[in-house]
Amino acid sequence: MEKYNKLRIEWDCRRGMLELDKIIMPFYLKHFDELTDDKKDIFIRLLASTDLQLFSWFFNRGKSSDSEIQSMVEYIQNVQKITTN
């Protein structure tokens, strides 16, 4: 039995903002399986955030107060080559 319900995670990757869909889903499809279990757990916690929080974090308008979540945001930005300059 798989530890992670991938259908549920994929569903949670679908967001209400196109900008987030273009960041989160491609990351999930391409990189989720490469993550350690700890990082997978953090990614799943990240998905519980609101679209407004995610937008703020991914587009450098704020930072998560949770350092693990913030590190995951920065990792995704780096891997997805997101720049907001």
Curated annotation (Swiss-Prot):
Question: Where does this protein have coiled-coil stretches?
Answer: none
Q: What does this chain do? A: An FAD assembly protein, which accelerates covalent attachment of the cofactor into other proteins. Plays an essential role in the assembly of succinate dehydrogenase (SDH, respiratory complex II), an enzyme complex that is a component of both the tricarboxylic acid cycle and the electron transport chain, and which couples the oxidation of succinate to fumarate with the reduction of ubiquinone (coenzyme Q) to ubiquinol. Required for flavinylation (covalent attachment of FAD) of the flavoprotein subunit SdhA of SDH and other flavinylated proteins as well.
- Pfam families cross-referenced by the UniProt entry: Sdh5
Q: Cytoplasm among the record's keywords?
A: yes
Q: Any keyword Transcription?
A: no
What PANTHER family does its record include?
FAD ASSEMBLY FACTOR SDHE (PTHR39585:SF1)
Q: Which family does it belong to?
A: Belongs to the SdhE FAD assembly factor family.
Kindly give the InterPro entries that the UniProt entry links to this protein: SDH (IPR005631), SDH_sf (IPR036714), SdhE_FAD_assembly_factor (IPR050531)
Gene3D superfamilies, per the entry: Flavinator of succinate dehydrogenase
Q: Where in the cell is it found?
A: Cytoplasm
Name of the gene this protein is made from: sdhE
The protein's name is FAD assembly factor SdhE
Any Gene Ontology biological process: succinate metabolic process
Keywords for the protein's UniProt record, in alphabetical order: Chaperone, Cytoplasm
Q: Name one GO cellular component term.
A: cytoplasm
